[in-house]
Amino acid sequence: AYRRDIYLEMGGFVKRAIFNEDMIYAGSLIQEGYGIAYAADAKVIHSHNYSCMQQFHRNFDLGVSQAEHPEIFEGVPSEGEGIKLVKKTIRYLFRKGKIWLIPGVILQSGCKYAGYLAGKKYRKLPRKMILWCTMNREYWKDL
């Protein structure tokens, strides 16, 4: 939830963002001295059941977003946090005796990471490849 008065004062979400408009807005709030609260008791239902290729495309857009907004994401350790999550998930699956799920976690994570890295380097890619990699082709129409 956002305070409407501050949202309007700050100009709302960035006008052009492929992904992460909420994080970009939150980062700009923090830079202006406002706070962001974590509500541990908040109930949110948000789920995706993406295939490996869909994960690649989604994380490509995530990488593009981070590359386009270094003022927000420069100090964010996305890769390190992702690796920690993968390791934690694999340990959990071992403890629960569900080791047959581990190859899927590794494959999904590899697709996410490959997409993310490609997105971070999108400026070096040919347009045709960018259009293949993105989940949001509309974003690239006017570029």
Predicted regions and their residues:
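Active-site-adjacent helix/loop segment of glycosyltransferases
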Residues: 36, 45-113
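Hydrophobic residues within well-ordered alpha-helices
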Residues: 29-30
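Juxtamembrane C-terminal module of membrane proteins
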Residues: 85, 115-143
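A conserved hydrophobic position in a structured secondary element of the catalytic/binding core
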Residues: 2, 21, 39
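Conserved nucleotide-sugar donor-binding
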Residues: 1-11
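Acidic donor-binding loop at a coil-to-helix junction in glycosyltransferase catalytic cores
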Residues: 18-25
